[in-house]
Amino acid sequence: MITEDEVNKLLSENEALFRFMGAKFEKIERGVAKLSFEYKEELSRIGGMLHGAIIFAAMDYSGSYAVRTLDVKEAYTLEFNVIFLKAMKTPPFTFLARVVRETKRYAYVEVEGFDGNNELCAKGNGIWHLIRD
């Protein structure tokens, strides 16, 4: 299985958005991925809160790498929904993704977004299409 360091290196070298966000995976294990990053003004919207698009991106990254631990060749997000519960203002921002159900071709994932006070600020869920060998 790919390690946190390998994923962080791969994405930092190849994905400008991941690099721009300053994101780092703290934990990757079968069916689980945890991502975090600090506050940057460039990631915020008016009012100093984390922009919804950045929250969505963090959830998609987290969910995608939770899914990639399932012995798949590739995986694609088919659908993803986010509920914004509370403004994310206090860093660090942490996103925890868990695969809830896996079939031969699909995975259902839930992702939670927390602020630096460990308060739940966003909840997401999605379906990924799995490509196996």
Curated annotation (Swiss-Prot):
**Which PANTHER family does the record associate with it?**
ACYL-COENZYME A THIOESTERASE 13, THIOESTERASE SUPERFAMILY MEMBER-RELATED
What is this protein's name? Putative esterase STK_17900
Top-level lineage group: Archaea
Q: Which UniProt keywords apply?
A: Hydrolase
Write down a Pfam family by its short name: 4HBT
Q: Does the keyword Cytoplasm apply?
A: no
**InterPro entries associated with the record:** ACOT13 (IPR039298), HotDog_dom_sf (IPR029069), PAAI_dom (IPR003736), Thioestr_dom (IPR006683)
Give the enzyme class: hydrolase
Q: What is its EC number?
A: 3.1.2.-
Gene3D superfamilies noted in UniProt: Hotdog Thioesterase
Name one molecular function that GO assigns to this entry.
Answer: fatty acyl-CoA hydrolase activity
Give the matching CDD domains. Answer: PaaI_thioesterase
Coiled coil regions in record: none
Supply the source organism for this entry. Sulfurisphaera tokodaii (strain DSM 16993 / JCM 10545 / NBRC 100140 / 7)
What the record says about family reads: Belongs to the thioesterase PaaI family.
